[in-house]
């Protein structure tokens, strides 16, 4: 077993005792850091940054040099999987990600390959191995993927969407085609995450960014069902240590009980869910991650500290809390505000652990 100097993040996910509440930030390697912007400029574009193991490692480590974070998260993108399926990912200025060959019908789904994670996605595994080597056991490394439903929204819509009318048209008019796509994605994501674990990821997270746009019935059928399949197929032990799994559905606070039934170790919460209520409902089964509004980082440090104190008190005494934002950090947040946030979590949380 590789020695970890700081394992409180992994311990908290497994609801084991810790000295202080661990903290990391979604998108902690990102555009709010001037050093990230410099490295991205060096890479040329976003996907070139993802595909260069040394540069992906560099941006993964940048926030850890600034802040005493309790975990590193692989620098990559959820759309690596559809890109490896041959959809032709590109980034349009001001538009976000686009695909040259979106999925429009069952015939398109039938043609999609299931990517070999050590081949078409080998650059991700190289990044995982490089980051693990450079972390030198300081903190654990989180691997991740998008959920099948969330990946499918981009693949069917052809990119980002506000109303999701194209994928919902497929969902209601041709559900068989969508189920075939989601099944293929579930298989691909399972292989992809297991390859990340074998390459050195010590915990994995499934980001279901767009599950919250569904009705409860559709969420169960088209999103949660496929995340459950992935959880069932994941390696849960590696290098002599349990590999915790976190599910995060943005806008999914009403479905926590169903999510906790999947066998995952932890649930991510966005900022619209009350953490005290979430703990009452599912804290006996899973750890909770979250859940400060990312926009709170625009506030003065004293106000950030008050919010941290409120969320810590909401979760209360005992184990099973990983502090995070309720979604990714915004790109124009002052870096010193992120520092005040991390420092406040550690300083104010010790009283809740004894």
Curated annotation (Swiss-Prot):
Gene field: hemE
Catalytic activity, as annotated: uroporphyrinogen III + 4 H(+) = coproporphyrinogen III + 4 CO2
Enzyme Commission identifier(s): 4.1.1.37
Pathway: Porphyrin-containing compound metabolism; protoporphyrin-IX biosynthesis; coproporphyrinogen-III from 5-aminolevulinate: step 4/4
Binding site for substrate: 27-31, 77, 154, 209, 327
Protein name: Uroporphyrinogen decarboxylase
Oligomer status and interactors: Homodimer.
Entries under PANTHER family matching the protein: METHYLTETRAHYDROFOLATE:HOMOCYSTEINE METHYLTRANSFERASE RELATED, UROPORPHYRINOGEN DECARBOXYLASE
Similarity comment text for this entry: Belongs to the uroporphyrinogen decarboxylase family.
Species of origin: Salmonella newport (strain SL254)
Keyword entries, A-Z: Cytoplasm, Decarboxylase, Lyase, Porphyrin biosynthesis
Disulphide bond pairs: none
GO terms for biological process, alphabetical: protoporphyrinogen IX biosynthetic process from glutamate
GO molecular function: uroporphyrinogen decarboxylase activity
Matches recorded under Gene3D superfamilies: 3.20.20.210
């Amino acid at each position: 077993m590789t020695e970890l100097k700081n394992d409180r993040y992994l311990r908290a996910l497994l609801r084991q005792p810790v000295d202080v509440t661990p903290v990391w930030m979604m998108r902690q390697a990102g555009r709010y850091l001037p050093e990230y912007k410099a490295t991205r400029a060096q890479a040329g574009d976003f996907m070139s940054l993802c595909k260069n193991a040394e540069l992906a490692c560099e941006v993964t480590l940048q926030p850890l040099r600034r802040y005493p974070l309790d975990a590193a998260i692989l620098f990559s993108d959820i759309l690596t999987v559809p890109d490896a399926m041959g959809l032709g990912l590109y980034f349009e200025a001001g538009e976000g990600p686009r695909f040259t060959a979106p999925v429009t019908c069952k015939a398109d789904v039938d043609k999609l390959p299931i990517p070999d994670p050590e081949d078409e996605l080998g650059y991700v595994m190289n990044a995982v191995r490089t980051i693990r080597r450079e972390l030198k056991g300081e903190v654990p490394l989180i691997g991740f993927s998008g959920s099948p439903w969330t990946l499918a929204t981009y693949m069917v819509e052809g990119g980002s969407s506000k109303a999701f009318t194209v994928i919902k048209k497929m969902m209601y008019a041709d559900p068989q085609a969508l189920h075939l796509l989601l099944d293929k994605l579930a298989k691909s994501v399972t292989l992809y995450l297991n390859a990340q674990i074998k390459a050195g990821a010590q915990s994995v997270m499934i980001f279901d960014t767009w599950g919250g746009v569904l009705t409860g019935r559709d969420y169960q059928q088209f999103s949660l069902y496929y995340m459950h399949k992935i959880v069932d197929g994941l390696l849960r032990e590696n290098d002599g240590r349990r590999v915790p799994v976190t599910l995060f559905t943005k806008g999914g606070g009403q479905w926590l009980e169903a999510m906790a039934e999947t066998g995952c170790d932890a649930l991510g919460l966005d900022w619209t869910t009350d953490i005290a209520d979430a703990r009452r409902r599912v804290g006996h089964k899973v750890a909770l991650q979250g859940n400060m509004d990312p926009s709170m980082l625009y506030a003065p440090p004293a106000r950030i500290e008050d919010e941290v104190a409120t969320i810590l008190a909401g979760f209360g005494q005992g184990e099973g809390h990983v502090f995070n934002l309720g979604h990714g950090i915004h790109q124009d947040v002052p870096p010193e505000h992120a520092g005040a946030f991390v420092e406040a979590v550690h300083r104010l949380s010790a009283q809740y652990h004894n």
